[in-house]
Amino acid sequence: MAIEEMLEILRTEDPKLSKLNEKYAVKENINGKTLMEIDRGAADFFGILNTGVHLNGITNDHENKKMWVATRSHQRKTFPGELDNMVAGGQPSNITRQENVVKECFEEASIPEELAKASEPRGFVSYNMQAGTTLRRKILYVYDLYLPSSFIPVPNDN
């Protein structure tokens, strides 16, 4: 039985196992080759290491630095209504991290592509966390983006 067929059966039995229509790469380790792909909504269910990008939006008006902070949608399954980076998203298997930063910047804050490309990688945060009956294993790659002081982020997705 193919993994997608198995997931469809599991979804009928467990409503928390969502389908997000975004493929994550399944690897033996972070630098390993892709063994298979799985829907992002199933990654935690199987304890699969997944990655994402988080971007700090910073303005500097020569007097003091300020950082934009987002509030997560109340409809999100994870951490609804909580504070978050200005831009954050899971890492699909079919694009690079930099391409994902540009995509997420546009979707979550209406940041133009040329401005988003100026983002600078700063490091990563990794964690493992039990969430109910699942294991959330994450590596979040952190970026900084200096924005014009006049810039106001506007969500461009749902």
Model-derived segments and their meaning:
Residues 1-82, 90-107, 111-154:
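N-terminal leader/linker segments that precede catalytic domains of diphosphate-processing enzymes
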